[in-house]
């Protein structure tokens, strides 16, 4: 692992700490390999299903739910006829506390979004407007190159591979970036000397 002075952007925290340092970071960095392999496998398999059978996300969800409900329905019917126990299904209910907590979370984030939109519309923050405009432009550009399903699958694969790859080969990546930056700086200086030969004479 690189020392803190050699890390990209001179950061002091590790990749694991930047990603939150919890279970999500462990999964993204393949420290829980079974979970990571499962996520990547499901992502690739679902993408192949979507592409091979021309499924949409709604078609897949509807088909899975229909199959699941049919199995449970037939199981319950046969259990009542054959005097067998019914399928052990818990009762799914949303408690009042969960609903209240979700509504508070949603209200806070919607209010933040509305406040940001208001500040941009009133031209109060030019930097924020630039960031939002660039982000929306990039999203529009990406959306024109691929559909939503492909974007979701690609995003999951990127999230599951890039951080782990960077953490494992950080020394090589940082060294390559520094090499490219140095070569770019040398090229810039040569072009500057070529464009302004009087600077070379003065030096």
UniProtKB/Swiss-Prot annotation:
Keywords: Endoplasmic reticulum, Membrane, Transmembrane, Transmembrane helix
Superkingdom of the source species: Eukaryota
Reticulon domain sequence ranges: 24-203
Region forming the signal peptide: none
Membrane-crossing residue ranges in chain numbering: 34-54, 55-75, 132-152
Keyword Endoplasmic reticulum: yes
Keyword Endoplasmic reticulum found: yes
Subcellular location, record wording: Endoplasmic reticulum membrane
Any one annotated GO CC term: endoplasmic reticulum membrane
Membrane topology classification: Multi-pass membrane protein
InterPro entries: Reticulon, Reticulon-like
A Gene Ontology biological process term: response to bacterium
Main location: endoplasmic reticulum
Pfam families the record matches: Reticulon
UniProt-listed PROSITE patterns: RETICULON
Annotated protein name in UniProt: Reticulon-like protein B12
Higher taxonomy: Eukaryota, Viridiplantae, Streptophyta, Embryophyta, Tracheophyta
């Amino acid at each position: 692992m690189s020392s803190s002075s050699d890390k990209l952007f001179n950061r002091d925290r590790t990749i694991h700490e930047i990603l939150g340092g919890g279970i999500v970071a462990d999964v993204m960095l393949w420290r829980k390999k079974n979970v990571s392999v499962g996520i990547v496998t499901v992502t690739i398999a679902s993408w192949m299903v979507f592409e091979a059978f021309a499924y949409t996300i709604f078609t897949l969800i509807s088909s899975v739910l229909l199959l699941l409900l049919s199995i449970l329905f037939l199981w319950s019917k046969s259990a009542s006829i054959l005097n067998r126990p019914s399928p052990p299904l818990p009762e799914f209910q949303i408690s009042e506390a969960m609903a209240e907590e979700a509504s508070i979370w949603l209200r806070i984030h919607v209010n933040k979004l509305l406040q940001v939109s208001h500040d941009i519309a009133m031209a109060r923050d030019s930097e924020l407007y630039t960031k939002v405009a660039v982000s929306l432009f990039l999203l529009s550009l990406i959306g024109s190159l691929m559909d939503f399903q492909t974007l979701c699958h690609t995003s999951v694969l990127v999230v599951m591979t890039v951080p782990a790859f960077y953490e494992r080969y950080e020394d090589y990546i940082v060294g390559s970036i520094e090499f490219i930056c140095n070569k770019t700086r040398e090229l810039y200086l040569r072009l500057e000397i070529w464009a302004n030969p009087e600077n070379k004479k003065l030096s």
